[in-house]
Structures are given as C-alpha cells and as structure tokens.
C-alpha cells in the first residue's frame, strides 16, 4: 500500500525503560541496529499498527507499555535503489512514518524476540537516549534524528541526561564522536559526553539488576569503533 508519491505508511517505536534508556534491536543476521518499526496494514490506524508491530518484533502487549507521545506528522526517508526489488523500482520510493514514544511499565523479561515465527531481531540492548547513529543503516539516520529530537521533550527527566546545546546534540546524533573525545571523557574532562552514549554495562555496574530473557547470552558490543565493550542481550 503506497501513497501517490511512492511512500509506504509505516510506524516507528522508541521504547524506553524506567531509566529512560532506549531499546535497540539488532537486525537478524546483520550488524545493523535499529528501533522497532513496520508497515501499516490496510484498515489499520497508526496506533493499531504500532501495537501489532510491538508484539511481533519485541513480544510486548499494550499492558506492558505506556504511550507517552507521537510525532505530529509523517517523517519520510527514501530507500536507495539497491535495496529495492527490481519489480518495485519506479513505484516504491521509501517509507513515511509516524513515530511513537513508549515507556515499558513491565520488566525486561517481558521482552521476547521470538513472539512470531518470523523474528526481526536476534539481539537487543538498552542505550542512553542520545547516542551516535553509526550502527543504523545510513538512509534511516535522518529520520531517527528527527524523531528523537521531536519526542525528546516527552521523555521522563528523572534519569534523562540531556545536552541542550543544539550543535553538540546534532554532532553527537550524527556519530561525530571521535576517539579523542572518548579518551577525554574517560579521563573525566568537563563537558565531554558519556562514552558511546553511556551504554550501561551489566557486568560492571554494582548491584545492577541482571534480567535476561530465556535463552539469552552475551556477545561483544557491536560499537567496537568506539572501543567500548558492553554486553548485549541475545536471543
């Protein structure tokens, strides 16, 4: 189902935990990480599609989340021809998305990447809200930045670390954090960002809750370009 401009209606989901960290899923059999998303079926409204995709991709039901906000309008991205089937070229142009900001009111163990027989992700992790987007496929990064920026004012502030300087926030979102910035951060230099977005390490945080879904294992952090080794949750 395409609109007259060749864009498929779609929903995207930014899922927060109680610490205002964001769910990231690793696309199955790839090194690409992304937020849950999916198409709107005929007869569905965006909210119905969001709850369906939430269950299909991460195994959650409406009672597991609270809807905090949604984007005011469609956000669009174009898909390069090399990612489009030959028979769809010339017709399909990309996706237009309504983004939802949700907060998990359940537990980590409620997440289930195998809720259907066609899983989208094979690993997942919690990251801080503002992190470099280098692990996202390039043509989606602009939409991610727009969605995160528009919905950021609805994020609960109790655990939310936010740098209000637009030039710093945009640089950080676009993955402009260099190794020298990381080294400065690790040395405690004022004004530096959390390393790799402050990705939590369940292995090193004293007293941290250790909640993994059934069958979960650890693998190295995919963001090896940042020199950070935090565990990830894999199913």
UniProtKB/Swiss-Prot annotation:
Enzyme class: hydrolase
Keywords in alphabetical order: Hydrolase
Pfam family, one: NUDIX
Chain span(s) of sequence motif Nudix box: 38-59
Family named by the database record: Belongs to the Nudix hydrolase family. RppH subfamily.
NCBIfam families recorded: PRK00714.1-2, PRK00714.1-4, PRK00714.1-5
Name used for this protein in its record: RNA pyrophosphohydrolase
Organism: Polaromonas naphthalenivorans (strain CJ2)
């Amino acid at each position: 189902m395409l609109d007259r401009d060749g864009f498929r209606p779609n929903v995207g989901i930014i899922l927060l935990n109680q610490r205002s960290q964001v769910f990231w899923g690793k696309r199955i059999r790839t090194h690409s990480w992304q937020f849950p998303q999916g198409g709107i079926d005929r007869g569905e409204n965006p909210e119905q599609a969001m709850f369906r995709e939430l269950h299909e991709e991460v195994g959650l039901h409406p009672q597991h989340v609270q809807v905090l906000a949604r984007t005011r309008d469609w956000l669009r991205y174009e898909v390069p021809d090399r990612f489009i089937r030959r028979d769809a070229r010339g017709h399909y142009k990309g996706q237009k998305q309504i983004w939802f900001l949700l907060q998990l009111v359940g537990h980590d163990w409620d997440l289930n990447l195998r809720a259907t027989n066609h899983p989208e992700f094979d690993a997942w992790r919690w990251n801080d809200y503002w992190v470099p987007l280098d692990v996202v496929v390039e043509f989606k990064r602009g939409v991610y930045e727009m969605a995160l920026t528009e919905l950021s004012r609805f994020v609960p502030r109790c655990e939310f670390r936010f740098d209000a300087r637009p030039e710093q926030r945009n640089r950080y979102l676009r993955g402009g954090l260099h190794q020298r910035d990381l080294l400065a951060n690790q040395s405690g230099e004022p004004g530096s960002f959390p390393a790799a977005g402050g990705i939590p390490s369940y292995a090193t945080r004293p007293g941290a809750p250790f909640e993994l879904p059934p069958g979960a294992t650890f693998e190295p952090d995919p963001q090896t370009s940042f020199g950070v080794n935090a565990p990830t949750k894999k199913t």
